[in-house]
Amino acid sequence: MKKIMIIEDDTIISKELYELLVNAGYEALILKDFSNAKEEILKSNIDLILLDINIPYQNGEQLLKEIRKETNIPVIMVTSRANETDEILSISYGADDYITKPYSPTILLLRISADLARIGR
């Protein structure tokens, strides 16, 4: 079973994503301690990350840059920021995909599946 980490500061959205992933057959993990996000990611043996840009302690794009220094785990940015600049920055920092809220659950699941298949996970 593929394990997906949710890094989202909005607890309602985190729970919605969790339920969506579990119902689709994934193992889901919600990151609750944002102060040690990179360390939690590296020790959790996950297959994919859903990452919001607006998270406590540091910007999600900065966390993405740090993640990319250590691992090639697929990262999908899931954010309310629908401007081109944030999307360009996220992709240039190594995001595999960029989805804006509100998102279509079907589209999100298809993109997760495609990103996992692309890297053979």
Regions found by a protein language model. Give the residues of each.
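N-terminal/domain-start alpha-helical segments
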Residues: 1-120
